[in-house]
C-alpha cells in the first residue's frame, strides 16, 4: 500500500466486514520500486503502524538514510528485508552444497550480512525505530550480537529458518525455496541460540 485511499478502503472494509482488528503497514517506496519514498506522514495519520517493502530490500544507501531521517522525525517504524540484490543474483537457495548438487543459483549469507551492517551504521546517525524482518545466518547473528547494546533496533526470524535447513529442500522442493533461504544446520542452531540470548525479538510464520 502506498497511498491514502487504499489505506482508507482497507480500514473501512476491516471495520465493516471483519471481526478482527487490522493494523496495516504501508510500503517504504512507491510501487515497491525502491526509488521514491511514500508519504510517511499522510499514511501514518491514516492509521499505518509501520513501513516495509516486503521482501524487497532498499538497496540505495542514500535513499535509506532519507527514509531513516523521516522515520525518526515522525517516530515511524521501518522494517527492512536484508538482502543485497547484487550478491543474491536471483538465487533461490542457500549458496552451499545443496545449491551445487541441484545446479541452482545460491544466495550467499553475505547478501544478508552486508545490508544489516550498512543499515546499523546508518542507524547510528538517525536512531529511528528499525526492524530487521528476518535473519537467517550465524554471521548476521554475530553482527547483531556486537551492536545490540550500542543502538536500538529489533530483529525477527521465520519459523522456517528455526525448524528447517537447506537439506530439507531435497530434490527441487520449490515450496522450500524461501526468502531468506534455508541455511545450514549450524545456522539453524545458532538462530535458536540467539532467541535464548534475546538477540531475536519476533518469530514470524
Task: Label each region the model flagged.
Residues 27-33:
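Active-site beta->alpha loop and helix N-cap motifs at the rims of alpha/beta catalytic domains
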Residues 35-203:
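Histidine/acidic residue-rich metal-binding segments in metalloenzymes
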Residues 26-27, 53:
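Short glycine-centered, acidic/aromatic-flanked micro-motifs in structured strand/loop junctions
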Residues 1-17, 26:
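Metal-associated gating/positioning segment near the N- to mid-region
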Amino acid at each position: 500500500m502506498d497511498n491514502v485511499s487504499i489505506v482508507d478502503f482497507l480500514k473501512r472494509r476491516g471495520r465493516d466486514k471483519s471481526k478482527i482488528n487490522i493494523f496495516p503497514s504501508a510500503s517504504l517506496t512507491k510501487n515497491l520500486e525502491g526509488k521514491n519514498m511514500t508519504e510517511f506522514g499522510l499514511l501514518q495519520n491514516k492509521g499505518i503502524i509501520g513501513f516495509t517493502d516486503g521482501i524487497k530490500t532498499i538497496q540505495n544507501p542514500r535513499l535509506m538514510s532519507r527514509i531513516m531521517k523521516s522515520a525518526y522525525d515522525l517516530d515511524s517504524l521501518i522494517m527492512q528485508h536484508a538482502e543485497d540484490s547484487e550478491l543474491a543474483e536471483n538465487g533461490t537457495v542457500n549458496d552451499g552444497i545443496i545449491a551445487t548438487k541441484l545446479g541452482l543459483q545460491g544466495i550467499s549469507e553475505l547478501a544478508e550480512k552486508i545490508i544489516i551492517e550498512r543499515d546499523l551504521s546508518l542507524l547510528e546517525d538517525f536512531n529511528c525505530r528499525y526492524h530487521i524482518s528476518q535473519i537467517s545466518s550465524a554471521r548476521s547473528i554475530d553482527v547483531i550480537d556486537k551492536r545490540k547494546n550500542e543502538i536500538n533496533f529489533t530483529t525477527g526470524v521465520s519459523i522456517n529458518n528455526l525448524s528447517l535447513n537447506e537439506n530439507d529442500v531435497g530434490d527441487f522442493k520449490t515450496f522450500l525455496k524461501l526468502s531468506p533461504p534455508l541455511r545450514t544446520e549450524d545456522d539453524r542452531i545458532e538462530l535458536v541460540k540467539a532467541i535464548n540470548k534475546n538477540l531475536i525479538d519476533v518469530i514470524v510464520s
